[in-house]
Amino acid sequence: MKVWLLLGLLLLHEALGDVAGQHPPKNKRPKEQGENRIKPTNKKAKPKIPKIKDRDTADSAPKSQSIMMQAMDNGRFQKPAATVSLMAGQSVELRCKGSKVEWSYPAYLDTFKDSRLTVKQNERYGQLTLVNSTTADTGEFSCWERLCNGYICRRDEARTGSTYIFFTEKGELFVPSPSYFDVVYLNPDRQAVVPCRVTAPSAKVTLHREFPAKEIPANGTDIVYDMKRGFVYLQPHSDHQGVVYCKAEAGGKSQISVKYQLLYVEVPSGPPSTTILASSNKVRGGDDISVLCTVLGEPDVEVEFRWIFPGQKDERPVTIQDTWRLIHRGLGHTTRISQSVITVEDFETIDAGYYICTAQNLRGQTTVATTVEFS
């Protein structure tokens, strides 16, 4: 009896051990719609680093920002295209953002102080208005903001704006020229331009020689055509000289430009080539004396003269006369001769000494001197 009792207790102990080793069932519930069904884990997620796209090195530099806006017919403003075509007679209003705006426009408008053009500076923008436009107004209109540090100002290259405006008119294909015959100087060390600009960007333009009569091809090597400038001679030489004209065709119509005389310049660019010569280096009292300062230069380069003379401190009265003319030296070579003459009447002892002439052009200046003695 005891044996059976012990055996029963042993079996009951093993049964209770098996029940204790089992995991109790989980209290499951239905997941709601949209609930994440991915089981959470204890793994640490690596932080995602956003990829940075490579940029061109040029992007790191400040880009030029167009500050120009054009007034439209509907009263709104928009950035103008690089080239704009308008009918002659239309008005133009351009605005450029900035408190200190400067403008550039066709020189034709500035030369004659044209009242049709108005430039104003408002608090936040500059304004340019052109009314009753003509084909002669065709050209580049640009603006830029001026940066100033005290009295020193410079142009802000990052804030500019520009547009080239064609003012078209029926039967007028070329921008009018102030004369019927223009001179273009050919310098061997810089480009030369035959300025036959058109009023319509769609016009086909060709260059022609008057004699012998033939078309001069714009081959892109020696000569190129730029509708904003005209025909550009990239490397002028003496063979290019002669009389030429342009021919434009558009809309089934053609037109001939004014004629251009191409003259080759033999004098190299640089400071004035200057000489000085006195009518006499020994002068008696009471006689008159003249000192001549001469410059040989390029036909289209102006020269300014300045004199220093012995009687200047004593306010000695003198006469100074400046002149210039073109001289032809054969084979079509042309030179500009500029002269300045200082004349002293009734020579006195205070007039004896050094006569110094300084000639200046855009490329520099040259000073020469000669002495005049009292005899």
UniProtKB/Swiss-Prot annotation:
InterPro entries: Ig-like_dom, Ig-like_dom_sf, Ig-like_fold, Ig_sub, PDGFRL. Residues 19-63 are annotated as: Disordered. Keywords: Disulfide bond, Glycoprotein, Immunoglobulin domain, Repeat, Secreted, Signal. The keyword DNA-binding does not apply. It is found in: Secreted. The keyword Ribonucleoprotein does not apply. Residues 40-50 have a biased composition (Basic residues). Residues 1-17 form the signal peptide. Disulfide bonds join C96-C143, C293-C357. Residues 62-159, 272-375 form the Ig-like C2-type domain. Pfam families: Ig_3 (PF13927), VEGFR-1-like_Ig-like (PF21339). GO terms for cellular component: extracellular region. Glycans are attached at N219. Forms a complex composed of PDGFRL, TNK2 and GRB2. This is Platelet-derived growth factor receptor-like protein. It comes from Rattus norvegicus (Rat).
